[in-house]
């Protein structure tokens, strides 16, 4: 396929929009940003905060550590966003918070000054923060995307508003007339200088991986597996290096490390999963700089392409689809053939389809480990000319039909699953 200039620009712009630095899990960060913007308009520290979030944002904010605070949950996200957040920081809203501000936020929580509840909203991704100080109050709403401020109100006066198209109705999809082979062809033929920016993903996520190997964050799965090599319980081979280095980055991210991840489709874990396997394999192969750049771009673009067929948040764990992106990048590094990519992604769909998202938490690193393991296993099968065939399950003989089948299940059939997961999570008894 020959890509017109306008389409080329649109594809690159989409990657630049979806692959951005993010400090901390992006759902609580979205609420922190709403609170930070509200504080900017309030002009003073709040006496109390009322926050409302969509069910999916509640699910993804309940069990994850807010970076730089050592504290789990949306109450901390709202408090620290209002006290120390940078309203212009986007997904790095909490980059410059101080220990003193964290202490202030914890005191507000201790004094029961923060209330977070579920909003009855049409938006899958929605956060609202209302800050109060004496007789002043400011309300800010974010919807559809993690940094998309759609509403600002102060003391009942509307200061800013813009329409927000429901995610599923968004017609402006750059991938509408593209398929997986087009994604592959574009990544290999686009001018190198136009996609060099993707190298930053390797830099940021490699630093996060090293942080996860240096300290115990979250479930410290990567660090645990690294220790087992020294004990002779697992081997120091390419598969385990992929798993260890990718999972360590997720450990650090979910465990509250004060380092940004390069995200993909609004998720740090998806960005990590789309990046680190490619970095590890490129290093193993002593790949050239151009090979690394193109493999990274192919990985991230394929991940975005697949995720574009999904709701922004759903019951399907999206690191599985991000791993299909890195599957493409790694398979290209090892074979240079689209056929291997097609075979491997088909096998992944036959393997890990249906892994549920039960909220952002330290256990996300387990799903990262599972997904990248499936990816490499599927690539090895393709190298041996083997794959899950179109005669089995939801896999079809054509890769895009298989991808569409997976995403249809996530978008439709798994919506009840999502509601059930959220119901279970919000009704669990609090730990003592």
Swiss-Prot record:
Short name of any one Pfam family annotated for the protein: SDH_alpha
GO biological process: L-cysteine catabolic process to pyruvate
One GO MF term: L-cysteine desulfhydrase activity
Protein family per UniProt: Belongs to the UPF0597 family.
HAMAP family assigned to the protein according to its UniProt record, in alphabetical order: UPF0597
Name this polypeptide is given: UPF0597 protein APJL_1638
Phylogenetic lineage: Bacteria, Pseudomonadati, Pseudomonadota, Gammaproteobacteria, Pasteurellales
């Amino acid at each position: 396929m020959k890509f017109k200039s306008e389409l080329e620009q649109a594809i690159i712009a989409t990657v630049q929009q979806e692959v951005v630095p993010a400090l901390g899990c992006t759902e609580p960060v979205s609420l922190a940003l709403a609170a930070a913007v509200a504080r900017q308009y309030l002009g003073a520290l709040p006496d109390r905060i009322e926050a409302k979030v969509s069910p999916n944002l509640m699910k993804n904010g309940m069990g994850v550590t807010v970076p730089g605070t050592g504290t789990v949950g949306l109450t901390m996200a709202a408090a620290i966003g209002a006290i120390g957040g940078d309203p212009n920081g986007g997904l790095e809203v909490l980059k410059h918070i101080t220990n003193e501000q964290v202490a202030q936020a914890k005191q507000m929580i201790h004094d029961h000054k923060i209330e977070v509840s579920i909003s009855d909203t049409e938006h899958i991704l929605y956060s609202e923060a209302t800050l109060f100080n004496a007789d002043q109050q400011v309300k800010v709403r974010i919807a559809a995307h993690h940094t998309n401020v759609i509403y600002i109100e102060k003391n009942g006066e509307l200061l800013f508003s813009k329409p927000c198209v429901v995610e599923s109705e968004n017609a402006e999809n750059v991938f509408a007339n593209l398929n997986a082979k087009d994604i592959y062809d574009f990544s290999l033929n686009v001018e190198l200088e136009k996609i060099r920016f993707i190298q930053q993903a390797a830099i940021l996520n490699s630093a996060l991986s090293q942080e996860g190997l240096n300290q115990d964050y979250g479930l410290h799965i990567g660090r645990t597996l690294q220790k087992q090599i020294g004990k002779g319980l697992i081997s120091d081979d390419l598969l385990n290096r992929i798993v260890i280095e990718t999972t360590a980055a997720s450990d650090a991210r979910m465990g509250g490390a004060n380092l940004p991840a390069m995200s993909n489709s609004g998720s740090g874990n998806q960005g990590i999963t789309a990046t680190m396997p490619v970095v590890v394999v490129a290093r193993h192969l002593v790949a050239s700089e151009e090979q690394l750049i193109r493999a990274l771009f192919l990985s991230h673009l394929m991940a975005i392409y697949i995720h574009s067929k999904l709701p922004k948040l759903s019951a399907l764990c999206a690191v599985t689809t991000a791993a299909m992106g890195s599957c493409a990048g790694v398979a290209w590094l090892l074979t240079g053939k689209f056929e291997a990519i097609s075979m491997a992604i088909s096998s992944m769909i036959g393997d890990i389809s249906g892994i549920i998202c039960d909220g952002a938490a330290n256990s996300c690193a387990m799903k990262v480990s599972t997904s990248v393991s499936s990816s490499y296993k599927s690539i090895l099968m393709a190298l041996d000319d083997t794959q899950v065939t179109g005669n089995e399950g939801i896999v079809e003989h054509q890769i895009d039909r298989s991808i569409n089948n997976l995403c249809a299940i996530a978008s439709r059939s798994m919506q009840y699953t999502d509601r059930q997961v959220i119901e279970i999570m919000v009704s669990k008894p609090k730990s003592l």
